[in-house]
């Protein structure tokens, strides 16, 4: 039985202009290598957005695109500004380096919510019946 689909040997190749047009429409990204050895890709439309990696905050600014041309050594991009250092993460109110979260110690006695309640022994049987019906 013959296959109803056309053979791949008879298909025509996509013209190079069409391939280029398709490639231009895809999301363009740049690879950025970090000092720790990791790398990430940033889309051209996502510059000036930052993230934290291994305790260091990184920002993908326009100046960072010059990394792939060897930074300040590139003859194409010469500017006399000093490179900004990455911003290290400052201690914050919820920043804790310990993976264990301490819980408040349990105490014996009245809590603030129940301090105004009378002693449970002073409830009458009708009070207890009402509480059970709730």
From Swiss-Prot:
Consequence of changing residue 38 to N: Loss of suppression of PTGS. Produces chlorosis and mosaic symptoms
Where is composition skewed (Polar residues) in this entry? 75-85
Which residue numbers delimit the unnamed Zn fingers?
Answer: 36-53
* Localization in the cell: Host nucleus; Host cytoplasm
Which molecular function term from Gene Ontology is one that the record holds?
A: DNA binding
> What ranges does the record give for the region Disordered, renumbered to this chain?
73-103
| Single GO cellular component term | host cell cytoplasm
* InterPro entries xrefs: Gemini_AL2
Q: How is it modified after translation?
A: Phosphorylated.
UniProt keyword annotations, A-Z: Activator, DNA-binding, Host cytoplasm, Host nucleus, Host-virus interaction, Inhibition of host innate immune response by virus, Metal-binding, Phosphoprotein, Suppressor of RNA silencing, Viral immunoevasion, Zinc, Zinc-finger
- One Pfam family, short name: Gemini_AL2
Mutation: residue 59 to S; reported impact is: Produces local necrotic ringspots and systemic necrosis in N.benthamiana plants
For this chain the motif Nuclear localization signal maps to 17-31
Please, one GO biological process term? symbiont-mediated suppression of host innate immune response
- The record's region (Transactivation) falls at 119-134
Where the protein is mainly located, per its record? host cell
Q: What is the similarity comment for this entry? A: Belongs to the geminiviridae transcriptional activator protein family.
Q: What is known of its domains?
A: The zinc finger and the transactivation region are involved in PTGS suppression.
Subunit comment: Monomer. Homodimer. Homooligomer. Self-interaction correlates with nuclear localization and efficient activation of transcription. Monomers suppress local silencing by interacting with and inactivating host adenosine kinase 2 (ADK2) in the cytoplasm. Interacts with and inhibits host SNF1 kinase. Binds to ssDNA. May interact with host RPS27A.
Functionally, this protein is described as follows: Multifunctional protein that modulates host antiviral defenses and promotes host attractiveness to insect vectors. Acts as a suppressor of RNA-mediated gene silencing, also known as post-transcriptional gene silencing (PTGS), a mechanism of plant viral defense that limits the accumulation of viral RNAs. TrAP suppresses the host RNA silencing by inhibiting adenosine kinase 2 (ADK2), a kinase involved in a general methylation pathway. Also suppresses the host basal defense by interacting with and inhibiting SNF1 kinase, a key regulator of cell metabolism implicated in innate antiviral defense.
Q: What is this protein called?
A: Transcriptional activator protein
């Amino acid at each position: 039985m013959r296959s109803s689909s056309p053979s791949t040997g008879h298909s025509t190749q996509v013209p190079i202009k069409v391939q280029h047009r398709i490639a231009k429409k895809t999301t363009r990204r740049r690879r950025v290598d970090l000092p720790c050895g990791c790398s990430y890709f940033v889309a051209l439309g996502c510059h000036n957005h930052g993230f934290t990696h291994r305790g260091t905050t990184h920002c993908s600014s326009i100046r960072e695109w010059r990394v792939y041309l060897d930074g300040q050594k590139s003859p194409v991009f010469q500017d006399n500004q000093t490179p900004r250092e990455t911003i290290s993460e400052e201690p914050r109110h919820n920043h804790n380096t310990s993976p264990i979260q301490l819980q408040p110690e349990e105490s014996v006695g009245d809590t603030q919510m129940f301090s105004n309640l009378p002693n449970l022994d002073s409830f009458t049987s009708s009070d207890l019946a009402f509480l059970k019906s709730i």
